[in-house]
Amino acid sequence: MSEPLIVGIRHHSPACARLVKSLIESQRPRYVLIEGPADFNDRVDELFLAHQLPVAIYSYCQYQDGAAPGRGAWTPFAEFSPEWQALQAARRIQAQTYFIDLPCWAQSEEEDDSPDTQEESQTLLLRATRMDNSDTLWDHLFEDESQQTALPSALAHYFAQLRGDSPGDALNRQREAFMARWITWAMQQNNGDVLVVCGGWHAPAPVSYSHLTLPT
């Protein structure tokens, strides 16, 4: 595999969970990189304890100005979460597994008034398909086990339509640059294939694989 296999998913989608599990088991990559808080990597083994699902990672940071509210973020896992199935399948094949998303404490505090192109694209899709909401549309398009063989290409097309040529807002650009550095590092090891599991909105984003190193 000369390039990473980037699997864009919808969080908590059973269809995407099945797809991720199947791809990891069939492709047997050396590295499985998952959208999740990178500062939890040293403790990832805790997720393999005898938990009763659902479970979640909660990340929190308090700003130096004690009067200002802190920032928190949840990373939830259920049996039907693609990220959970990626963790389990990667462990079974003994792949090196890392979370690659920017920790909440490192995210920019700057306001961004970029237009929400994702919502605009979603509205156009709903209008074209005459569906009531995005959940109904998703179920209609993807949550059918008989569609599994065509699922990868269908997902790629769907998320490309949602993203279009939008660069994303400042936070998404920051997160995607961070994820790209992890992908670059894994590719530069030159000792096995790389499979990436991330939200579909991020999957079509242009990624440069040169002059980047492992985030610290």
Label every model-predicted segment.
Residues 150-181:
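Glycine-rich phosphate-binding "P-loop"
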Residues 1-161:
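Structured, acidic catalytic/metal-binding patches in enzyme active sites
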Residues 1, 181-191:
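A short acidic-Thr-Gly-centered motif at the start of a beta-strand
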Residues 12-16, 78-82, 175-179, 187-188, ...:
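Short, glycine/acidic-rich beta->alpha junctions
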Residues 210-216:
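Conserved small/polar residues in nucleotide/adenosyl-binding loops
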Residues 9, 30-34, 183, 193-200:
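Beta-strand elements within well-structured catalytic alpha/beta cores of enzymes
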